[in-house]
Amino acid sequence: MNTLFMHCRPGFEGEVCAEISEHAARLGVAGYAKGKPQSASAEFVCSEEGGAERLMGELRFNQLIFPRQWARGGYVELPERDRISVLLAQLADFPVFGSLWLEVLDSNEGKELSTFCRKFEVPLRKALEKAGRLVDDPGRPRLLLTFISGRRVFVGVASASNSALWPMGIPRLKFPREAPSRSTLKLEEAWHQFIPREQWEQRLGDDMTGVDLGASPGGWTYQLVRRGMLVTAIDNGPMAESLMDTGLVQHLMADGFTWQPKQPVDWMVCDIVEKPARTTSLIETWLGEGLCREAVVNLKLPMKQRYAEVRRLLDRMEATFKARKIRVSIACKQLYHDREEVTCHLRRLDLKPR
């Protein structure tokens, strides 16, 4: 139970290691991080008993940037037959669980195991319920079984309220056929990640206004229109006719980094390919000058020290807003639909309600 196991995007294992090591050092949890390149996972092995539990207790999962999912536990080697009996024996010292997720890594090997997991889950679930190890109670810990192979599994536990929203941190979003580009799924995932579902009507209402900077062809604009917002799309490139036909979109041929609205808007979204430091300046202007209430903005990460750069820019934003004496909540996550980038959500907390 003394290893913290984390899923991530393949190629970002080093970022997960850097991030969790920084948090562990700050909290005084001794150990070391490791992650095989392109494995889609990383671990923090704690040197002292209870270290992994303390990390998960002190940290909020939604404040971590690069991990998609986490669990504390250890590896179990399984026989070719009667895997369930071995797992039941291993779980004897674990708490009673309120839910069960079988997970695989986001790799070719992991995808090959997904069929096995679907078939294995039904008899395993029945056996756990019969043994009194699994009950229907969302308040109890979640059992997370990450299969590395059919014979090797990481048996982990996590709080259902302090871990990923979906198995492996991968949302099952359906691409809408009428959307102009697949980038639309990035913004839809951001809504789920950063805004509690019960607040959607209030914060993503059809009486709101939005701006999409670098909008062409309209993947992110589509999500705003889908919520019924009046949208100003800023881009020198063309917009999808289907969006223009809704009557909810005004397309202005302008530079997304220099254009500003005459009146404040509710939402600003931006997925422009640009150096992250320049995009950060854009965020500081829009939130700092009250041009929008909330924003979802992607920071592109072409550099090598990706976690260090993201951390530097987030700290810079926080210091900028503090110096201006304005209250802004800042969240950042590498979403499943992100590539070499992270998604930031910002919200002014000191503006009067609409």
UniProtKB/Swiss-Prot annotation:
One of its GO terms (cellular component) is cytoplasm. It is found in: Cytoplasm. S-adenosyl-L-methionine binds at residues 183, 216-219, 235, 255, 271. It catalyses: cytidine(2498) in 23S rRNA + S-adenosyl-L-methionine = 2'-O-methylcytidine(2498) in 23S rRNA + S-adenosyl-L-homocysteine + H(+). Its EC number is 2.1.1.186. SUPFAM superfamilies: S-adenosyl-L-methionine-dependent methyltransferases. GO terms for biological process: methylation; rRNA processing. It comes from the Bacteria. It holds the Pfam family FtsJ. The active site is at 300 (proton acceptor). Its main location: cytoplasm. One of its GO terms (molecular function) is S-adenosylmethionine-dependent methyltransferase activity. Catalyzes the 2'-O-methylation at nucleotide C2498 in 23S rRNA. Belongs to the class I-like SAM-binding methyltransferase superfamily. RNA methyltransferase RlmE family. RlmM subfamily. Monomer. This is Ribosomal RNA large subunit methyltransferase M. It comes from Pseudomonas putida (strain ATCC 47054 / DSM 6125 / CFBP 8728 / NCIMB 11950 / KT2440).
